[in-house]
C-alpha cells in the first residue's frame, strides 16, 4: 500500500517536469517503488526484493529479463512495421547503438504482458524454483526445461486476447496498433492520436 501511495504522490509531479532528465528521474523512482511493491506479492520461494539485470540475481529477475527481451523484439517489429526509425525516440537517448524508440514504447507493455505472465507462473506453481533454474557465476538463469516452459507461456500470452484497446485484439496486434498510432501522431503532429493503455 505504501508503494502505491508513494507512486500516486510522485505521479502528481510528472506534468510539472520541465526537462526529459527530470521526467526520467521520476520514471526511475516510480520504477523502483513499483518493483518493491511487486516483490510483496511474490510467493516466498521466489523471493524478489528489487530489479536486477546483467546478470539477473534470482529466478524472478531471470524470468523478467528474458520476458522483457522477448517483448523488446515484439516492439521492434511493430516499430519497423509502422515505418518508424527504432533509434529515434523521445525520452530514451541514443547511445551505444541502442534503439531508443523501442525503449520508449515498451514501457506501457511491461506490466500487462511480462509482469502479469511471470506472476501467473509463480502464483500457480507452474514453474519450479529448484528444478527450472540454474546459477552461473553470479547470475541466475532459466535452464533448458525452464526456458521451454517460459517460452511456451509467453507465446500463449502474446497471442491471447486483451481489452486494452477499443476492440478485441491479441497483445501482439495491440502492440502493432500502438506503434501505428505513434507513427500517426508524429506524422500529423497530433497528440490525440495516441492514447496510452491503462493497466486494469
What are these regions (language model features)?
Residues 1-200:
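Active-site helix-to-loop segments that bind/position phosphate- or nucleotide-bearing substrates
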Amino acid at each position: 500500500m505504501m508503494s502505491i501511495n508513494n507512486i500516486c504522490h510522485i505521479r502528481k509531479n510528472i506534468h510539472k517536469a520541465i526537462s526529459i532528465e527530470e521526467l526520467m528521474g521520476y520514471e526511475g523512482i516510480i520504477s523502483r517503488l513499483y518493483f518493491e511493491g511487486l516483490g510483496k506479492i511474490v510467493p516466498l520461494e521466489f523471493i524478489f526484493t528489487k530489479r536486477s539485470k546483467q546478470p539477473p540475481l534470482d529466478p524472478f529477475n531471470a524470468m523478467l529479463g528474458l520476458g522483457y527481451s522477448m517483448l523488446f523484439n515484439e516492439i521492434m517489429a511493430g516499430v519497423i512495421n509502422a515505418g518508424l526509425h527504432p533509434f529515434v525516440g523521445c525520452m530514451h537517448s541514443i547511445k551505444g547503438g541502442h534503439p531508443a524508440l523501442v525503449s520508449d514504447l515498451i514501457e506501457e507493455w511491461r506490466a500487462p504482458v511480462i509482469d502479469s505472465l511471470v506472476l501467473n507462473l509463480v502464483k500457480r506453481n507452474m514453474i519450479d524454483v529448484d528444478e527450472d533454474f540454474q546459477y552461473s557465476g553470479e547470475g541466475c538463469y532459466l535452464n533448458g526445461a525452464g526456458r521451454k516452459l517460459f517460452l511456451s507461456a509467453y507465446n500463449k500470452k502474446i497471442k491471447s486476447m486483451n481489452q486494452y484497446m477499443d476492440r478485441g485484439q491479441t497483445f501482439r496486434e495491440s502492440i502493432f496498433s500502438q506503434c501505428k498510432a505513434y507513427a500517426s501522431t508524429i506524422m500529423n503532429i497530433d497528440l490525440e492520436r495516441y492514447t496510452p493503455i491503462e493497466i486494469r
